Amino acid sequence: MRIKVVRIFNTYGPRMHPDDGRVVSNFIVQALKGEDITIYGDGRQTRSFCYVDDLLEGMIRAMNSPDDITGPINIGNPREFTILELANRVIELTGSRSKLIFKPLPPDDPRQRRPDITLAQKLLGWAPRIELREGLENTVHHFKAQLFGSMVQPEEIPVAFVPEFSD
């Protein structure tokens, strides 16, 4: 039996559920609804965000790698953004007038989350390609359609990378 283990880091993108509780979906939903955007702590903690297409490409490369490469291999984006930067980008991309509100940081919340993707680069020749702005634009587009049933046609909503399989 072939075994591959990948460790996934903070993935976002179209087809996320609006109530999944993750920071990207929370901020987008709050901004689109004109609600205050809730930041826990001072917002200077950092996170990295991996767009779903990049994740899928990394996973497919791992699945198609030689049998002696089993992992674990980190699949994520090592570029860090503060939570404040993320909130401000979401406000900008949605055109929202949302205000930022700050609540106490949970005691177990790390100041930084950033994957080391050295093995993915070395063994799979993989690195993320989608910049945060582009990924957020696609994700906001999806959420607008999902939340408001806008005039967005399904074929206009970006689709994640789909591999072609041969028989």
Task: Tell where the protein language model's regions lie, with residue ranges.
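Conserved beta-loop-beta element that borders a ligand/cofactor-binding pocket
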Residues: 1-14, 25
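C-terminal substrate-binding subdomain of Rossmann-fold SDR/epimerase-dehydratase oxidoreductases
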Residues: 10, 14, 29-167
